[in-house]
Amino acid sequence: MVRNKYYVVRKLADVIYALPVGQGVVRDYPVMQLGALEYDIVRKIDQDENPRKVFDELAISYMIAEEQRDSFWEDFCTAAEDLASCNIIQNYVVNEKLNSRTKMRRIKRFR
């Protein structure tokens, strides 16, 4: 079953664009947790690339032959879904929000 790449990438782009840090997500992001493909996906979208072109551009930059694109597509979908469902990114956002709330509570407590 071939998954709709536009849906997956659009969903991923929405998650990345929703990050509070905005542009430069890759620089402010715990990159050590990312695999190479995930990092490249985030980097491409972070550069204001059109999300619909991300898959094709990565396939070209990885020199994936036409006959191997289906296999690469499955890897791409898995990486995009991991990022979008947010095993990584949403945890980062949640931790940032929790950290800021904790800081606010501490500030209020000491006033």
Residue ranges and their predicted role:
Residues 2, 18-20, 62:
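Residue-level detector of functional hotspots within protein domains
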Residues 9-40:
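Short alpha-helical segments that sit at the start of domains
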Residues 30-111:
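Long, charge-rich, low-complexity alpha-helical segments
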Residues 5-9, 19, 55-57:
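Generic detector of short, locally flexible boundary/turn motifs and exposed helical patches
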Residues 1-14, 111:
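Hydrophobic packing positions characteristic
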